[in-house]
Amino acid sequence: MSSRRGGGGGGGRITDEEINELISKLQALLPESSRSRGASRSSASKLLKETCSYIKSLHREVDDLSDRLSELMSTMDNNSPQAEIIRSLLR
């Protein structure tokens, strides 16, 4: 069995240019406050750590919002127009 790296192409090794491009794309996904100036290969480790931290914070935020929504829904009449609107948004 062979292991695959990269996504698609010819099965060769990923180039430094491709790594730098992926780092730039990943950096662009982070909020402005988490971005480091001039991502280079030496900062790839830092960028990956920041990305992991950001993803964890997003998970916490989703959990918090889910809890808040559950609390809100438990206080509403299930047949109310507001409850129906919320249900339609969740579909």
Swiss-Prot record:
The residue range of the signal peptide is none
The membrane-spanning stretches of this chain are none
Protein name, UniProt field: Transcription factor ILI3
Q: Name one GO molecular function term.
A: protein dimerization activity
Q: Which family does it belong to?
A: Belongs to the bHLH protein family.
Q: Which residues form the bHLH domain?
A: 3-58
User: Which terms under GO biological process does the entry name?
Assistant: regulation of DNA-templated transcription; regulation of growth
Q: Could you tell me the keywords of this UniProt record? A: Growth regulation, Transcription, Transcription regulation
Function per UniProt: Atypical and probable non DNA-binding bHLH transcription factor that integrates multiple signaling pathways to regulate cell elongation and plant development.
Instruction: Enumerate the InterPro entries for this protein.
Output: bHLH_dom, HLH_DNA-bd_sf, PRE
Q: Cite the record's note on assembly.
A: Interacts with LO9-177.
